Amino acid sequence: LAKTDHLAILQFGLRHWLEWRSRSPGEYPDLSEAHLPNLNLRGANLSNTNLSKANLTGAMLLGANLKDAILSLATLSYAELTEADLTKANLVGSSFLHASLRGAELVGVNAIASDFSAAQLQNADLGEANLSGSELRKTNLRGVNLSHADLSRTNLLEAELAEANLYKANLSQANLREAHLTGVYLLGANLSFSSLEGTDFRWSNLSKVNFQGANLSRANLRGANLTKADLTGVNLQGTIMPDGTIHP
């Protein structure tokens, strides 16, 4: 079917779309550049769908299947994606500003240079995700799985990461100033040359973390585990150390 036919089927109604997809398992829908703001796509099967440059602002995608979908340069600001499945989706350059992705599956997504600022991602699974160069300012990432994820050069200013799993994550050159990382599991993570001024690491597992060249001034490390952490060239001015003392 032509691209215009795919869009017509979707606009005819969600039930019609779901029936068509079940009858056409080999079809790869093309909805690129489609204008779909505020559309109700709850539980929709959008797997392997091309939604590049689509406008899905405020769309209802709760529980939707977006596995292997192409959402590069798409706009999903204020969209509802709670418990949606975006496994291995292409999100390069996309905008999820203020979107809700609570409990969503985002394993292995390619989200280079995307914008998740002020989004809600509590308990989402972002294992092995590539978020390099992305905006995550004031994003709620409480309890998320980011193990083995690439967060290099990301902006996580004032982000909420309490109780997150960042096992062996790459956060080199990331901006985590004033971010909250209490009770976080960072074993073997790379935080080299990152900005960590005023970051809250209380009671976190920071063992074997690479902090080379990082700025930890005014950070709070009270109760943190720094066993075998690499602190070469680190700025610890005014940092609260694990025992509660303040570094000169």
Provide a role label for each language-model segment.
Residues 7-8, 16, 21-248:
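Tandem repeat scaffolds
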Residues 1-2:
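Terminal targeting and flexible regions in eukaryotic proteins, enriched
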